[in-house]
């Protein structure tokens, strides 16, 4: 996931990973 912050990146990663 591409994000400016680790928190946002982590949230995106979880969202994509649980897709």
Curated annotation (Swiss-Prot):
Reactions accelerated catalytically: H2 + A = AH2
Keywords: Iron, Metal-binding, Nickel, Oxidoreductase, Periplasm
Class of enzymatic activity (EC top level): oxidoreductase
Needed co-factor(s): Ni(2+); Fe cation
Keyword Membrane part of the UniProt annotation: no
Keyword Metal-binding: yes
Gene Ontology MF: a single term: hydrogenase (acceptor) activity
GO cellular component: periplasmic space
EC number annotated for this UniProt entry: 1.12.99.6
Localisation per UniProt entry: Periplasm
Organism domain of life: Bacteria
Primary subcellular site in the record, as a coarse category: periplasm
Family: Belongs to the [NiFe]/[NiFeSe] hydrogenase large subunit family.
Quaternary structure annotation from Swiss-Prot or TrEMBL: Heterodimer of a large and a small subunit.
Name assigned to this protein: Periplasmic [NiFeSe] hydrogenase large subunit
Organism annotation: Desulfomicrobium norvegicum (strain DSM 1741 / NCIMB 8310) (Desulfovibrio baculatus (strain Norway 4))
Taxonomic lineage: Bacteria, Pseudomonadati, Thermodesulfobacteriota, Desulfovibrionia, Desulfovibrionales
